[in-house]
Amino acid sequence: TALVLALVLLVCLAAGCGKKKEDNVSGSSEVKKPVMIKVGASVTPHAEILGVAKELLAKEGYTLEIVEFNDYVLPNTSVEDGELDANYFQHRKYLADFNEENGTHLVEVVPVHYEPFGIYAGKTKSLEELADGAKIAVPNDGTNEGRALLLLEAQGLIKLKENVGFTATKLDIVENPKNLEIQELDAAQLVRALGDVDLAVINGNYAIQGGLNAGKDALAVEDKDSEATQTYANVLAVKEGHEKDAGILALAKALQSEEVKKFIEENYDGAVIPMF
């Protein structure tokens, strides 16, 4: 009898220990760390910068999948629909305007860089040579058109309605001494259009993609201390409620790392400027 009791006791103890160990394993498994982070990005410079972050994240146990886009809509709708975890392609104002116009719920996580807008030569090779009735191409989306027109105003080429700011369109031009013809084109087509217009005001990423550099090739660029620097900072964005996800925080940290800062400064010659 004593032997039977001893055996029962040993079995119970073993079962208890096993359960306790099982509970501990179960408890530790509740700490979830996503392995895959899927991010949408413009090809240049965003996907290139993410390539540096990808290496840093790999050391933390994350796999970063970079999905490249050539438009400004799908990267946002894909995050909203849950097809992507985040995106990195747009500036603050575009993000705010997109949410308002489309009823999406996207939020900024961190700013990463700033791309100065530039005025680039087409048929006309300098601002001084600009003839009466010259054609100037600008982005046709509301967010970037205002920014382009403000740069033209800063160069004394046009004058806009007072306090119209970044919402300006060509309809807000009140003075146009050279009778410039403002052509609104898709931002992605501006570099290709240079052969057909006198000048074009081009987004930083599309300029780089087209082999142009704001620091070297532009006839004029936005002032580094202008309001545009903050307003148009390019950000990492996610759907609201996911800002504190472990993978997103790891990605944000990688994008604001010294390695990324060094990569930007060494590879873009002033066409891309880190915001950290």
Functional labels for PLM-detected ranges:
Residues 1-36:
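Short, low-complexity disordered leader/linker segments with a strong preference
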Residues 32-44, 62-68, 135-136:
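Short, well-ordered beta-strand elements
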Residues 66-77, 164-192:
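Short helix-initiation/N-cap motifs at beta->coil->alpha
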Residues 80-90, 134, 157, 178-181, ...:
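Alpha-to-beta junction loops
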Residues 97-109, 123-124, 196, 201, ...:
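Ligand-binding "clamshell"
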Residues 109-158, 261:
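A conserved helix-loop-strand patch within extracytoplasmic ligand-binding domains
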Residues 116-127, 232-245:
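A bilobed periplasmic-binding-protein/Venus flytrap-type ligand-binding module shared by bacterial periplasmic
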Residues 144-153, 255-275:
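Periplasmic-binding protein-like
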